[in-house]
């Protein structure tokens, strides 16, 4: 898996490539000037993390009134199925995910070789998976479960020695002073909505221990609104990385479009977020899942592709409405974890391939003067 360079000509070529890498590093340092070097390195060197989409939509499982909703992501079923807010909200009355076990999820992430977990604290539907003083529309006050799932996962991550990140949707279809549901999810943010978001972000960064990243999503903030949220995050937790979807160049790392991958090395800190199936992020009861081995190899190649281009890979699971992890997704993660136990040295703590050309046989990663050849 490793080659060493000895000839003078090869050393000269490597030095040229390392000079280009140095320029890349300078650019990255400029992009992350708001956070410490140590915080950036912890995030950048982890390479591989778990994304969890879990909420009221998990209870519906991509089905409304007995019929599969085939349009759009299942976590946005309220929008794509045209469900009235009151009807959708009634889902909370039966949402009681007794099989959600934060310790087991942390154990699965560690077995999969993942270094952190990012969970949806609130998606576009506005339903909060944490106990909040800002609204009763949350998993503690509005459901028979009466549980703070973010707290449970935060505690499990702390005891399990794995970092926690939080997804937070700026779009909020439940907040009365927010723009109503739209087809593009890029609505402007009213002053009242901004105040509401800041209050929730303050809770999330105050009540749940160290947070490795805050994964903002959607909405069209003004430059001032983005700046306010970015500065709030770093005031409360200076080492918390902020995702590029906050907008207006207020970020610590950029995020590719859903399930998209760059063709080359990007000149900044970046991440690809990927779902098991492109059609949805949350649980879909009628999803055709196919062969476990085929899916495992697909996502493993995606991980290698991202890391060889200098990025981090955030791979999603969508627990069922009862809180259990779909067995298919569990087996995929375990399969990737098995490969990483053998060859993780070619992934963790590495830098992007110094080569700009693509190879038929696979790709490379770099650690110091050592090149790792990963055959595909």
Can you describe what each PLM-predicted range is?
Residues 33-376:
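Mature catalytic domains of secreted/periplasmic carbohydrate-active enzymes
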């Amino acid at each position: 898996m490793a080659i060493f360079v000895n000839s003078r000509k090869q050393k000269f070529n490597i030095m040229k490539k390392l000079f280009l890498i140095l320029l890349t590093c300078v650019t990255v340092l400029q992009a992350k000037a708001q956070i410490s070097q140590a915080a950036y390195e912890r995030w950048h060197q982890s390479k591989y993390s778990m994304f969890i989409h879990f909420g009221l939509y998990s209870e519906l499982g991509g089905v409304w009134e007995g019929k599969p909703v085939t349009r759009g992501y299942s976590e946005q079923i309220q929008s794509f199925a045209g469900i009235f807010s009151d009807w959708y909200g009634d889902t909370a009355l039966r949402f009681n995910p007794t099989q959600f076990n934060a310790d087991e999820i942390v154990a699965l992430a560690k077995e999969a070789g993942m270094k952190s977990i990012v969970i949806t604290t609130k998606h576009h539907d506005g339903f909060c998976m944490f106990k909040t003083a800002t609204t009763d529309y949350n998993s503690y006050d509005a459901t028979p479960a009466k549980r703070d799932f973010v707290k449970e996962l935060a505690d499990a991550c702390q005891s399990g020695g794995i970092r926690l990140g939080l997804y937070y949707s700026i779009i909020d279809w439940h907040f009365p002073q927010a723009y109503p549901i739209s087809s593009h999810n890029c609505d402007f943010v009213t002053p009242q909505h901004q105040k509401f978001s800041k209050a929730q972000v303050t809770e999330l960064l105050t009540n749940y221990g160290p947070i490795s990243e805050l994964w903002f999503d959607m909405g069209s903030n003004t430059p001032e609104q983005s700046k306010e949220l970015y500065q709030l995050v770093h005031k409360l937790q200076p080492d918390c990385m902020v995702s590029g979807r906050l907008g207006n160049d207020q970020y610590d790392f950029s995020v590719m479009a859903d399930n998209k991958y760059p063709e080359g090395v990007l000149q900044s800190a970046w991440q690809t977020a990927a779902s098991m199936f492109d059609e949805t992020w949350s649980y879909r009861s009628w999803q055709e899942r196919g062969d476990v081995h085929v899916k495992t190899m697909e996502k493993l190649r995606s991980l290698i592709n991202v890391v060889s281009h200098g990025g981090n890979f955030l791979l999603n699971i969508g627990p069922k409405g009862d809180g259990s992890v779909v067995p298919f997704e569990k087996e995929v993660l375990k399969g990737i974890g098995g490969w990483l136990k053998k060859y993780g040295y070619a992934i963790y703590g590495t830098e992007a391939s110094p080569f700009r050309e693509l190879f038929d046989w696979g790709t490379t990663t770099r650690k110091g003067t050592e090149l790792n050849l990963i055959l595909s």
